[in-house]
């Protein structure tokens, strides 16, 4: 209500909402009466209707005048509801810098505490094995301040380095030889840095059933979704096992052909995520004016 009142006081000509689809939808829905004053509504970062709740495409299209998308394949879901939709690309790939890889294996168990705990309890034996089997590699766990003590407790007596500082995490990630990461937006950063990866995810059995019932995509990684095939190995739920991961880690450490294949697709994906290699912010600016 406070934001709504502030907007009304400012009397804008244009309102642009960014991401946060539930919040943005509720806010813009309350402000539709401003159309009488010729106020326009634009949104940046489409709701992931291709993954779940496809009906949101119609709802969004009824409220907005323009939509700017990160991924080209998203456009069709909104164009069919007559919303002017523009693919502008993903900002993360505009300043892409690929660094030489070092002997680093990185584990990224997630962002929320419950997610980190669920994934890390499954990964614990894998991390322990990796630290011993690849003793000439540095093993890093990239996490957050809010979960550092929990991570330390779960992984006590295992020879790993736990990093929470943002800049240090980016530095480690960019130089990693291999990453084992929880499903999520981190896959875009791994793609940006061209780090061969394995995607994992574990959750409660009830949540698992709901995901299988309501999620509309076959894959978790955005690269796999984009290319409609498994480029990045995924071990989700019941496939997230010690034996599966130990085998896959061994393949991606030793098999140069497999690593090269991932990197080629990552590079291809990165190039497709920019429109004519232009800064997405500049493209949006041109479309607004």
PLM regions: where:
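Nucleotide-activated sugar donor-binding and catalytic core shared by glycosyltransferases
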Residues: 1-289
């Amino acid at each position: 209500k406070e934001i709504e009142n502030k907007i009304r006081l400012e009397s804008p000509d244009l309102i642009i909402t960014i991401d946060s689809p539930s919040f943005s939808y509720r806010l813009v829905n309350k402000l539709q009466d401003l159309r009488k004053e010729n106020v326009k509504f634009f949104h940046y970062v489409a709701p992931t209707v291709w993954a779940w709740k496809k009906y949101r495409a119609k709802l969004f299209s009824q409220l907005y005048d323009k939509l700017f998308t990160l991924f080209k394949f998203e456009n069709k879901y909104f164009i069919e509801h007559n919303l002017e939709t523009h693919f502008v690309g993903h900002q993360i790939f505009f300043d892409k810098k690929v660094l030489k890889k070092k002997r680093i294996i990185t584990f990224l168990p997630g962002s929320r505490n419950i997610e980190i705990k669920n994934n890390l309890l499954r990964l614990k034996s894998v991390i322990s094995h990796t630290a011993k089997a690849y003793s000439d590699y540095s093993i890093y766990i990239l996490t957050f301040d809010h979960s550092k003590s929990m991570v330390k407790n779960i992984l006590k007596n295992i020879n790993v380095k736990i990093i929470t500082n943002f800049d240090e995490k980016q530095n480690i990630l960019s130089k990693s030889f291999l990453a084992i990461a929880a499903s999520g937006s981190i896959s875009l950063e791994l793609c940006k840095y061209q780090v061969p990866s394995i995607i994992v995810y574990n959750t409660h059995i009830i949540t698992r059933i709901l995901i299988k019932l309501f999620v509309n995509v076959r894959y978790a990684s955005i690269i796999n979704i984009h290319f409609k095939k498994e480029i990045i190995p995924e071990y989700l739920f019941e496939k997230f096992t010690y034996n599966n991961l130990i085998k896959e880690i061994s393949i991606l450490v030793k098999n140069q052909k497999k690593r090269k294949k991932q990197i080629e697709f990552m590079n291809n994906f990165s190039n497709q995520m920019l429109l004519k290699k232009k800064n997405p912010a500049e493209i949006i600016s041109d479309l607004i004016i």
